[in-house]
């Protein structure tokens, strides 16, 4: 199956971010991808401040404008779309991800289960976490999510591993403060820590990291496709907007 991992550069306007996302989805579909994955909080960037008066406006309901537009686009183009976003429900905010199917449905929704996306000072009645991990059967196998820091929590990793997914989608928003050469640090050090964790899943994995503009968002971008043995199949350089394409055999190891 041909998959795409899309990295959209974050801007201050949610509408501008969506237009970039829409353009990348169309490009992926035009190039024959059956699935496209976007990063964590792709509509806004991970720019929450722990202040509800600022952050609730970042949220999107699963039946709201932008998610509905993604559902329509998935159906029109015949492509599965996965993305992270801030979800709002009953004035509570979640760090969520959805997988949208071409038949016009949200096939899978996941709420990040660890609290690493906000500080301990954030009001608990507003900033909330999910409580479970689910897997969905698709024409290309069993699919599950891990959102960013969940990858480094053993309980989350073990929960997903027990689901025996064929494909794990990993939207992220990772930054690196006070690192002079982030690409070198990633290539020689940090990336291998990620691969060790991914290998424990024994599943094919697609990883999409948010790309900030350096002003409102500092994430450094980048994307990877990793096989069931934790080997890199394809990768996309940091600090670049665009699409990584990869042919993945979800029944075997590559």
What are these regions (language model features)?
Residues 1-9:
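Short beta-strand segments enriched in small/hydrophobic residues
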Residues 3, 17, 25-54, 74, ...:
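Active-site beta-strand/loop signature of hydrolases that rely on acidic residues for catalysis
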Residues 6, 110, 136, 208, ...:
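Hydrophobic residues at beta-strand termini and immediately following loops
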Residues 9, 87, 149, 211:
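Residue-level signal for short, function-critical loop segments
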Residues 30, 92-94, 218-220:
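Short, small/polar residue-rich loop motifs at catalytic or cofactor-binding pockets
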Residues 59-81, 152-241:
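CN hydrolase (nitrilase-like) catalytic-core segments centered on the catalytic cysteine
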Residues 83-85, 96-99, 134, 223-225, ...:
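Short beta-strand scaffold segments in enzyme catalytic cores
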Residues 88-167, 177-192, 249-254:
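Active-site catalytic loop in hydrolytic enzyme cores
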């Amino acid at each position: 199956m041909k998959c795409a991992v899309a990295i959209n550069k974050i801007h201050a306007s949610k509408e501008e971010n969506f237009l970039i996302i829409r353009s990348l989805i169309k490009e992926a579909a035009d190039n024959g991808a059956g699935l496209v994955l976007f990063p964590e909080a792709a509509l806004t960037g991970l720019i929450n401040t722990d202040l509800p008066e600022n952050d609730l406006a970042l949220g999107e309901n699963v039946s709201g404008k932008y998610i509905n537009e993604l559902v329509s686009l998935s159906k029109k183009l015949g492509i599965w779309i996965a993305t992270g976003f801030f979800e709002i429900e009953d004035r509570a905010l979640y760090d969520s991800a959805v997988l949208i199917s071409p038949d016009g449905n949200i096939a899978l929704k996941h709420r990040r289960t660890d609290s690493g996306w906000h500080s301990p000072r954030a009001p608990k009645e507003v900033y909330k976490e999910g409580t479970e991990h689910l897997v969905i059967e698709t024409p290309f196998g069993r699919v599950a999510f891990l959102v960013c820091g969940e990858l480094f929590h053993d309980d989350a990793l073990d929960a997903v591993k027990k689901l025996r997914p064929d494909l794990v989608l990993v939207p992220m928003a990772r930054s690196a403060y006070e690192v002079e050469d982030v690409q070198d640090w990633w290539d020689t050090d940090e990336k291998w820590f990620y691969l060790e964790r991914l290998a424990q899943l024994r599943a094919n994995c697609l990883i999409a990291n948010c790309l900030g503009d350096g002003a409102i968002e500092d994430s450094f971008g980048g994307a990877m496709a990793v096989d069931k043995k934790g080997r890199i199949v394809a990768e996309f350089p940091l600090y670049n907007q665009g699409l990584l394409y990869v042919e993945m055999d979800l029944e075997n190891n590559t």
